[in-house]
């Protein structure tokens, strides 16, 4: 099979578009098109060498790569779903907070994929100011040519959200400062859609100060309809993950090992990495089953 045929077959299979393949290979899409049609005027090796390198890399990845299950229906996910449902139905604001690596983000992503009018953004140190987080939300809502001015952004977001009966999820919201949280509160009240603040304990601890009516967070605290703490992964979570990977959850020795990993901070994330490495090892040994060893 010629190099040109291999590339053509990949595109025709629907796995990649020509533009996607060109990006992965690291060549210009127009140049790749010309080469495929035997009309490329430049040096053939300038296209063929990166193609060969990418095909070899892709083959190596195929031999060793093991993809983790995209979403596993764990008990913790249902705690998150219940809070998100409440935020949307009432509508109100909720918090889901606690340890990292316990499945909060994955559950929110699954909820967004399976429900209409759910938008999810992620705060970060670089995207935590009031103007930055409003801009992120505007982009997520599909507002084209979103302005950078805070007042215009806020008005456009309100206009877009009104009447949607939707839900806005803000992950890593522990990064958000007071003025950003206050603006979110005001928007939520005006448009009457649900808002969910997801993050670590800082999300709750800061807002909880509002239980004192003299505290700056008092107005925000009084609008929170539900606070859902997730302090650690449960054994039910770990059992569901083991079964999703095709492991025997009745194997006590195996489950003891998995529980010792999964119940620590960042447990489910670490557990997934361990299982992936174990699966790669098993794949290399042509073994269908991997155990605690």
Labelled PLM ranges:
Residues 93-100, 187-216:
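Sensor-1/coupling segment of RecA-like P-loop NTPase cores
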Residues 71-88:
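Pre-Walker A adenine-sensing motif
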Residues 124-139:
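Conserved phosphate-binding/catalytic loops and adjacent sensor/switch elements of nucleotide-binding enzymes
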Residues 129-133, 144-183, 189-196, 233-241, ...:
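Mid-core helix/loop region of P-loop NTP-binding domains shared across ATPases and GTPases
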Residues 117, 210-231:
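A short helix-turn-beta junction within AAA+ P-loop NTPase domains corresponding to the substrate/partner-engaging
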Residues 1-53, 235-293:
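C-terminal alpha-helical "lid" subdomain
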Residues 88-110, 125-126:
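Walker A/P-loop nucleotide-binding motif
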Residues 115-126:
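Conserved catalytic segments around the Walker B and adjacent sensor/switch elements
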């Amino acid at each position: 099979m010629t190099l040109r045929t291999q590339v053509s077959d990949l595109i025709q299979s629907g796995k990649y578009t020509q533009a996607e393949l060109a990006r992965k290979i690291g060549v210009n899409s127009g140049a790749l098109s010309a080469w495929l049609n035997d009309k490329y005027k430049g040096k053939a090796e300038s296209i063929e060498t990166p193609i060969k390198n990418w095909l070899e890399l892709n083959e190596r990845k195929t031999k060793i790569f093991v993809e983790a299950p995209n979403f596993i229906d764990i008990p913790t996910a249902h705690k998150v779903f219940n809070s998100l449902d409440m935020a949307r139905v009432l509508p109100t604001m909720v918090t889901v907070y606690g340890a990292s690596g316990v499945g909060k983000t994955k559950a929110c992503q699954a909820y967004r994929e399976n429900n209409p009018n759910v938008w999810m953004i992620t705060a970060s140190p670089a995207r935590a100011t009031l103007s930055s987080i409003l801009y992120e939300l505007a982009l997520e809502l599909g507002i084209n040519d979103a302005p950078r001015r805070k007042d215009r952004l806020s008005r456009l977001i309100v206009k877009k959200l009104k009447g949607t009966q939707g839900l806005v999820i803000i992950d890593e919201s522990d990064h958000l400062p007071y003025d950003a949280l206050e603006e979110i509160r005001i928007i939520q009240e005006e448009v009457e859609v649900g808002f969910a603040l997801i993050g670590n304990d800082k999300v709750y601890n800061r807002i909880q100060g509002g239980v004192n009516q003299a505290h700056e967070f008092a107005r925000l605290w009084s609008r929170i309809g539900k606070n859902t703490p997730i302090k650690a992964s449960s054994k039910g979570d770990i059992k569901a993950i083991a079964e999703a990977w095709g492991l025997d959850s009745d194997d006590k020795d195996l489950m003891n090992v998995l529980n010792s990993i999964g119940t620590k901070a960042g447990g489910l994330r670490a557990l997934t990495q361990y299982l992936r490495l174990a699966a790669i090892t098993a794949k290399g040994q042509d073994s269908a089953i991997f155990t605690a060893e």
